[in-house]
């Protein structure tokens, strides 16, 4: 291995290893493409500080170069002025820093397939690299950047890179961005690029969507639509509330009107009932009497033959005995017995029996030509003293055993009280009428003045 030093007279190396002087540009080269691993080199700071220095792997650009210098045969005391065969090297495990070459505007970091060196493992901050405007970051496929190197997981932030107006964030498929680099999982914040007017955020399936200005406009439009919807709902609610209030008021008015009409209806019904009762009373008072002649012409039969006699007030016979009483009446009055509904009044013997017999003898002497008729009268309740109702309807099931008369020939006269049928009936004038009918002991028709002794009802 030869070590060539250009740019001045060769000087002897000292016993101890010294650093390479950074006064001139220096370069390491090896014969035959390089040898193995010089261990005497502790730092390449001077080499990296040179503007024209380049670091590359064995298969990249440059001359013969050398690979993996891990050892050295002789120390370097002077600086290397220039390099005839600028070689490349890869995998600098002994390099402590790469600050100076990264500060160079033309510096570039690439993988083993392009220019430069690949997969640097030494930890150094990429802030200086990211500050440089032409600096490009790319994946190991070399898309979207000039040099192209894989995503650096040791990068702490992308604030300075993302503050660039032309910065763009895209997914690993390279859509939606100009240069297209994969999504950086180590990016902690995207505040600065999102605030940039020209920034674009894409999901990788389309060419990106509108800027934040468009998103804000769309959001404002949605807010306006929501406000309009809420305003319409509020107006609808107010309208429904007003309608409900009007309906409730109308319902209360209808309820009060119904109560008023019910009260008026009750009052009118009471007045109508009073008027009808008054009309019935007037009609019953002004009704003409029903003449017996009309009933006789219609063929009606008397229910009984009643004879008023003071003998009705005498002592009643024992129960179960029905003995007739012989009464003497005038012949003219006796002839009226055949008239239906005939009532015979026998002038009462209101004195003692002896006086009555004497008075009767005198009357016989006075009325020799007129004559008298004796009539047998029975008390009320005796057999054959009232006409049979079933016989009047057509046929009586009892036949000859019936206790009621089956015709005028079987009808017997009945002794009545002296005041029988002399007073008007109070129940007959009522609207319901008298429940006793023809058996009532009170008069149901007005008494004729002409009938003093005998009259028909």
Curated annotation (Swiss-Prot):
Coiled coil: 215-276
Disordered as annotated region, ranges: 51-73, 102-130, 195-221, 280-329
Keywords: Coiled coil, DNA-binding, Metal-binding, Repeat, Zinc, Zinc-finger
Tagged with keyword Zinc-finger: yes
Origin: domain of life: Eukaryota
Transferase found in the keyword field: no
Disulfide bonds: none
PROSITE patterns named among the record's database cross-references: ZF_C3H1
GO terms of molecular function: DNA binding; mRNA binding; zinc ion binding
Segments forming C3H1-type zinc fingers: 382-409, 419-447
Record-linked Pfam families: zf-CCCH
Residue spans of biased composition, Gly residues class: 57-66
Record protein name field: Putative zinc finger CCCH domain-containing protein 21
Organism, as annotated: Oryza sativa subsp. japonica (Rice)
């Amino acid at each position: 291995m030869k070590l060539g030093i250009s740019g001045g007279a060769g000087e002897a190396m000292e016993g101890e290893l010294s650093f390479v002087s950074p006064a001139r540009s220096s370069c390491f080269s090896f014969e035959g493409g390089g040898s193995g691993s010089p261990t005497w080199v502790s730092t390449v700071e001077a080499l990296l500080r040179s503007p024209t220095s380049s670091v590359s792997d064995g298969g990249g650009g440059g001359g013969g170069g050398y690979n993996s210098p891990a050892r050295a045969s002789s120390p370097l005391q002077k600086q290397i002025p220039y390099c005839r065969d600028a070689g490349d090297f890869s995998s600098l495990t002994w390099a402590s820093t790469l600050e100076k070459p990264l500060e160079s505007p033309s510096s570039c970091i690439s993988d083993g397939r392009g220019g430069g060196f690949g997969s640097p493992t030494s930890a150094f901050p990429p802030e200086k690299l990211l500050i440089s405007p032409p600096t490009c970051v790319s994946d190991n496929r070399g898309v979207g950047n000039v040099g192209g190197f894989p995503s650096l997981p040791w990068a702490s932030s992308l604030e300075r890179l993302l503050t660039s107006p032309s910065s763009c964030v895209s997914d690993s498929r390279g859509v939606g961005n100009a240069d297209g680099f994969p999504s950086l999982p180590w990016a902690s914040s995207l505040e600065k690029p999102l605030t940039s007017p020209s920034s674009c955020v894409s999901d990788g399936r389309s060419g990106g969507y509108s800027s934040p200005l468009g998103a804000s406009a769309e959001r404002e439009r949605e807010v306006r639509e929501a406000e309009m919807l809420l305003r319409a709902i509020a107006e609808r609610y107010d309208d429904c509330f007003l309608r409900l209030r009007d309906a409730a008021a109308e319902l209360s008015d209808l309820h009060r009107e119904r109560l008023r009409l019910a009260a008026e209806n009750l009052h009118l019904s009471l007045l109508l009932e009073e008027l009808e009762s008054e009309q019935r009373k007037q009609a019953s008072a002004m009704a003409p009497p029903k003449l017996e002649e009309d009933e006789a012409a219609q063929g009606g039969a008397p229910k009984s033959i009643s004879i008023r006699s003071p003998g009705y007030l005498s002592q009643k016979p024992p129960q179960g005995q029905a003995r007739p009483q012989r009464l003497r009446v005038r012949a003219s009055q006796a002839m009226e017995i055949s008239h239906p509904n005939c009532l015979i009044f026998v002038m009462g013997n209101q004195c003692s029996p002896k006086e009555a017999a004497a008075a009767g003898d005198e009357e016989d002497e006075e009325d020799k030509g007129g004559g008298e008729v004796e009539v047998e009268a029975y008390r009320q309740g005796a057999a054959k003293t009232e006409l049979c109702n079933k016989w009047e309807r057509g046929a009586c099931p009892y036949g000859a055993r019936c206790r009621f008369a089956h015709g005028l020939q079987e009808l017997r006269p009945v002794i009545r009280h002296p005041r029988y049928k002399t007073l008007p009936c109070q129940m007959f004038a009522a609207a319901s009428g008298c429940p006793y009918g023809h058996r009532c002991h009170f008069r149901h028709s007005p008494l004729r003045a002409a009938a003093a002794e005998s009259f028909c009802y």
